Each structure stands twice: as structure tokens, then as C-alpha cells.
Amino acid sequence: MKRYIALDIGDVRIGVARSDIMGIIASPLETINRKKVKSVKRIAEICKENDTNLVVVGIPKSLDGEEKRQAEKVREYIEKLKKEIENLEIIEVDERFSTVIADNILKELNKNGAIEKRKVVDKVAASIILQTYLDMKK
């Protein structure tokens, strides 16, 4: 079985998560700063390191289910990934509330202020997106 990678794609950062080898549990992996790193190449490296071409991508939607303007940017980024990564399989998932849930989890865990939230919220959001997908496919 192959691992899945998930992406929470933003203008500044991309949260990355991966599944366990059985495709049951999602875990935060890293946050890519798009201004400091060639993000498409880094994601290609992550796919290679994890021997996968299965990438779950969160698509931003409004509360009523309509796609937000950001969804168009995410799809443009997906096209860049497809050009870089051979045989890439993209699975789109509604990402409504993933960042809000991640933010709430981190607030609860960070009562002593040890976690710098903005550095981890995106990868936690990516893990929520991936876990949502893994749970749906059971």
C-alpha cells in the first residue's frame, strides 16, 4: 500500500501531512514557506521520499459550499505540481474548517505558550484534510 500526502495550500505557506503506510492515520509532516523554498520541487521530493504519487489537496469553500477565489489559485498550483511530478494523482477534498479546527487544537495544546502556532497550524490543517479523506474512504 502507498502513503498519501496532503497539502493545505496557502499564498504564504503550504502545510504538508502524510499517512501511515496502511493509509489509516494522518500526521503533520512539515510547513513549506513558499517565499523561501521552491515549493513545487520540495513537494516532488516529499512524494519521492515517501514513494507516493497520491496527493490529497484541500479546496477552500465558503460555508454554503461555494468555492472561494482561493480555490482557483489552488487549482493553478495543482497544475504546476502535475507538470513536475510524473503520474501525479490529485484527490480534491473540501477543506472547510480545517484551519479553524487546527487552530483550536493548537490553542488547547499551547496553554503554556510553547508552540509558535503560525509555524505549525498549516501542517496540522493538512493532517485534518488527510484524515478526513482517509476516514471517508473506509
UniProtKB/Swiss-Prot annotation:
CDD domains: YqgF
Recorded GO MF terms: nuclease activity
Organism: Fusobacterium nucleatum subsp. nucleatum (strain ATCC 25586 / DSM 15643 / BCRC 10681 / CIP 101130 / JCM 8532 / KCTC 2640 / LMG 13131 / VPI 4355)
EC number(s) recorded for this UniProt protein: 3.1.-.-
Physiological role: Could be a nuclease involved in processing of the 5'-end of pre-16S rRNA.
Primary residence: cytoplasm
NCBIfam families: RNAse_H_YqgF (TIGR00250)
Top-level taxon: Bacteria
A GO CC annotation given for this chain: cytoplasm
Family: Belongs to the YqgF nuclease family.
Record HAMAP family: Nuclease_YqgF
Compartment list: Cytoplasm
SMART domains reported for this sequence: YqgFc
SUPFAM superfamilies per record: Ribonuclease H-like (SSF53098)
Protein name, per record: Putative pre-16S rRNA nuclease
